[in-house]
């Protein structure tokens, strides 16, 4: 209940501050909202983000650029199931199109893509090694079960609870390690 109350208090404080916002702050927030909407539309429908961004008034572009980058960067994550999310490539292209320093953003994009490739390679290698390690002992386990049940049994390494537990543990450590690297790269991209 204390958390709910404190969250409510925070919301009330924010509403109070918002009520006292200057005209400049309201205008900046309006531009940020426009930027967020451009990014969402770009991710949803594709389209020409550069043209949409260029159509904004010059005064709006600074705030909108920051908001666009924030939305696009939120769509760049480590692949959870071993495959890249197709929206990630689109988000990277969008970042490149709104960057103030195109060359630096291009370098960061290449670095980020390398991080993602390294993550997938380490993940896949570890999965195969773990599978081979458990596979070595599965034959003996399978024979013991067949003797116990008096029928043929087919065991899949990936379905063993011990394998799944080991894999979850390793994957959690791997995600922690690569998330920090990815976040540092995304911070750099936000500033470009």
Q: For each predicted feature, which ranges?
A:
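Leu/Val/Ala/Ile-rich N-terminal alpha-helices, chiefly Sec-type signal peptides and the beginnings
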Residues: 1-60
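Intrinsically disordered or highly flexible coil/loop and linker segments, enriched in small
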Residues: 21-24, 44, 48, 121, ...
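Non-transmembrane, amphipathic alpha-helical segments
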Residues: 23, 27, 104, 108-111, ...
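Long, low-complexity intrinsically disordered regions enriched in acidic and polar residues
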Residues: 30, 44-51, 60-67, 158-173
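Long amphipathic alpha-helical segments with strong coiled-coil/leucine-zipper propensity
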Residues: 36-127
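Amphipathic protein-protein interaction modules
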Residues: 120-160
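Alpha-helical oligomerization segments
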Residues: 148-192
